[in-house]
Amino acid sequence: MFEARLIQGSILKKVLEALKDLINEACWDISSGGVNLQSMDSSHVSLVQLTLRSEGFDTYRCDRNLAMGVNLTSMSKILKCAGNEDIITLRAEDNADTLALVFEAPNQEKVSDYEMKLMDLDVEQLGIPEQEYSCVVKMPSGEFARICRDLSHIGDAVVISCAKDGVKFSASGELGNGNIKLSQTSNVDKEEEAVSIEMNEPVQLTFALRYLNFFTKATPLSPTVTLSMSADVPLVVEYKIADMGHLKYYLAPKIEDEEGS
């Protein structure tokens, strides 16, 4: 049997909001260590990897490993029925074809329970190699979301240029071009407002803004976001989830066309 109780149920609601527009269905791998999900998006351009460690839940029990095929749109609809303050419990029998979701109001005067049908999914796990990155930028997640949103009014792609002193986001399109440069911050009162850059070598890469705007739906999960970049390997956009784990998105850079062609 699997049972996990999360007093801060809003975390699960935010996770689903961050996944559902990118992935239709995915396999939730449940083990004694926690909950993991790894899936390509429906157009096979980006990859999502979610980890929620068992110790981040308030109670957690998993007698044997489970692979639950979940329609994320359905799960998101059910989680919308939970209040932001609700305590959420997930429960499934070992060979179950349904997942139970129980929402308890904090005053315990209201309990809602839902059962969601599970799916049979054929899933291939992709190995994600450990990688050293040329540039790692940590910045406020709201700032990154705004930059991606603003530049998508200008063009379809963003060029991210990372140097020691700062990181530049540029886009160009029919109406012209736009550049946003963030300098490394030296002294900030709050750590989550800082921009920090670890650079081994400068990097300049181009990415589709459509996907970055999907990724920034995870902004409510974390006050900061980390961008890890190296030439010719996918960008990693990572949102830490409190004391529970992380949500990582991987996106391959666009290959620049030959001069003007």
UniProtKB/Swiss-Prot annotation:
Belongs to the PCNA family. There is a cross-link at residue 164 (Glycyl lysine isopeptide (Lys-Gly) (interchain with G-Cter in ubiquitin)). Its main location: nucleus. Gene3D superfamilies: 3.70.10.10. Residues 61-80 bind DNA. Phosphorylated. Phosphorylation at Tyr-211 by EGFR stabilizes chromatin-associated PCNA. Acetylated by CREBBP and p300/EP300; preferentially acetylated by CREBBP on Lys-80, Lys-13 and Lys-14 and on Lys-77 by p300/EP300 upon loading on chromatin in response to UV irradiation. Lysine acetylation disrupts association with chromatin, hence promoting PCNA ubiquitination and proteasomal degradation in response to UV damage in a CREBBP- and EP300-dependent manner. Acetylation disrupts interaction with NUDT15 and promotes degradation. SUPFAM superfamilies: DNA clamp. GO terms for biological process: base-excision repair, gap-filling; cellular response to hydrogen peroxide; cellular response to UV; cellular response to xenobiotic stimulus; epithelial cell differentiation; estrous cycle; heart development; leading strand elongation. Coiled coil: none annotated. Disulfide bonds join 135-162. It comes from the Eukaryota. Pfam families: PCNA_C, PCNA_N. Keywords: Acetylation, Disulfide bond, DNA damage, DNA repair, DNA replication, DNA-binding, Isopeptide bond, Methylation, Nucleus, Phosphoprotein, Ubl conjugation. This is Proliferating cell nuclear antigen. One of its GO terms (cellular component) is nuclear body. The modification N6-acetyllysine is found at residues 14, 77, 80, 248. CDD domains: PCNA (cd00577). One of its GO terms (molecular function) is identical protein binding. It is found in: Nucleus. Homotrimer. Interacts with p300/EP300; the interaction occurs on chromatin in UV-irradiated damaged cells. Interacts with CREBBP (via transactivation domain and C-terminus); the interaction occurs on chromatin in UV-irradiated damaged cells. Directly interacts with POLD1, POLD3 and POLD4 subunits of the DNA polymerase delta complex, POLD3 being the major interacting partner; the interaction with POLD3 is inhibited by CDKN1A/p21(CIP1). Forms a complex with activator 1 heteropentamer in the presence of ATP. Interacts with EXO1, POLH, POLK, DNMT1, ERCC5, FEN1, CDC6 and POLDIP2. The gene is Pcna. There is a cross-link at residues 164, 254 (Glycyl lysine isopeptide (Lys-Gly) (interchain with G-Cter in SUMO2)). The modification Phosphotyrosine is found at residue 211. Auxiliary protein of DNA polymerase delta and epsilon, is involved in the control of eukaryotic DNA replication by increasing the polymerase's processibility during elongation of the leading strand. Induces a robust stimulatory effect on the 3'-5' exonuclease and 3'-phosphodiesterase, but not apurinic-apyrimidinic (AP) endonuclease, APEX2 activities. Has to be loaded onto DNA in order to be able to stimulate APEX2.
